[in-house]
Amino acid sequence: MRVIGLTGGIGSGKSYVAERLAERGAAVVDTDAIAHEITAPGGAAIPKLVEAFGPGILRADGAMDRDAMRALAFSDATAKARLERITHPLIREISLSRGAAAQASDACPYLVYVVPLLVESLSGHHSWRALVDRILVIDCPVETQIARVIARNGLPRALVESIVARQATREARLAVADDVIDNGGALADLLPQIDRLDLAYRAH
C-alpha cells in the first residue's frame, strides 16, 4: 500500500483535500485531529499539560484551552518546546498505530498521513520522510493562507502572521514535494487535481 505524507501551511486546505481523498477511498490519518483528541477532556496529554503549565491552561470542561496555549506557544519558545515534547510523541504513536491498522486491513488503496509540520520534521529521529513514499504539498500564496485563517478562526492578523512565520516557508515545502496541489484558486480547479492524484496513487 502506497503511503502519502500530506502537508501544507496553515490555511492551505489540507483538511479539505484529505476529506476528498477519503471520499475516494483512501485511509486518512490526520495528526491534527489526533492532537485535538489528546487535548480534549480526559485526553492522554491533559495530565502532563497540567503538570507543565498548571490548571489554568484548561477550559472549564477540562479540555486544553487552545487559544491560550497557542498565544503562549507563539510568544514563548520555551513553552512551545515544552508543549511539543508532551504532544508530539503521543501524536506520532497514535498516528503510526492507526496507519499500521489501515495497512494491515488492506481495505483501502493507499494511506494518507496528514502532517502539518511534516517539512519541519524531515530531519532528526522523528522524521516522517522514512515513513512515507511520497510527499504531497497543498500550496497557495501566503496572503491567501492568512486571509483564510482570519476568516475561519477570527484570529488577529498579527497572530496568524506569527504562526505562518514559524512554519516552514512555502519555498521549503515545494522543494521537498513529490506532488503539489495548487489551492490558490477556485474550487473547480482543485477537484480535478485531487482526482488525478487519486488515480496515480491507486496505480502503484
UniProtKB/Swiss-Prot annotation:
Entry's Gene Ontology molecular function annotations = ATP binding; dephospho-CoA kinase activity
Q: Which Gene3D superfamilies match?
A: P-loop containing nucleotide triphosphate hydrolases (3.40.50.300)
Asked if the Swiss-Prot or TrEMBL record annotates the protein with the keyword Nucleotide-binding, the reply is: yes
Instruction: Provide the E.C. number(s) assigned to this enzyme.
Output: 2.7.1.24
Its localization reads: Cytoplasm
Question: What superkingdom heads the lineage?
Answer: Bacteria
Its protein name is Dephospho-CoA kinase
* Species of provenance: Ralstonia nicotianae (strain ATCC BAA-1114 / GMI1000)
